[in-house]
Amino acid sequence: MTHAGMPYEFQVTRHVEFSETDLAGIMHFSNFFRFMESAEHAFFRSLGFSVTGSRSRIAVCLPRVHAECDYAVPLRFEDEVLVRLLVERKGRRSLTYQFRFCRLNGSTPEEVARGRLTVASVELQANGGMKAVPLPKVIANYIQQAPAHMLVDGFRAKVNSSPARERRRRERPKRAIRTPSRNGHHKTN
C-alpha cells in the first residue's frame, strides 16, 4: 500500500486469487467493485480514519450511492494488479473516486479497467433511516480533490480505446458485409 503523501491519491497492489475467478479463469466482474471498496478503506486507514463511525473520529457513515466499472482486458488468476484511487470530486456531502486497474505482470503496466465510486455522508437515524449531512470537518479539511491533470477525462472513451483493445481490433479478420441489391438479392462486399 502506498499513500503518495497527498490526501487525494492512494494505490494498493494485490494478486487475483483463485476464489475471485470464474470457470474460465477470469476474474469475476464483481471483484472489481470489491477491489475499489478495499482500496477506499485502505486509503482512509492510511489517513488515520475509518469508513465506519463506530471505530473512528467520524460520526457519520459513507454508504455507496453510485458505482461503475468499465473493463478493457480481463484479469486472470495470479495476475498482479495495481489499484489506484484518486479523489475526483469532493462535494459538501459526498466524495467521488476514480479507480484505475493496471496489470503489473509484464514489463510495462497495462490498464485493464477503470471504475468510479461515489459515497454520501449520512447520519444514521433512530428509526433506521439515513439523513444526508455535510462531510465531517476532519475529512472535509483533510481530503482534497485531485488536480485536474491527474484525472481521467472522457472516462469511458479512454478505457474502451486501450492499447490492448486497439491491437485486438486491428488483428481481427475483416468480415464480409452483405448488402441487399436493387433486385432483392444480397451481395457480399
Residue ranges of predicted features:
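Hydrophobic beta-strand-centered segment that forms part of the acyl-chain substrate-binding groove
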Residues: 43-95
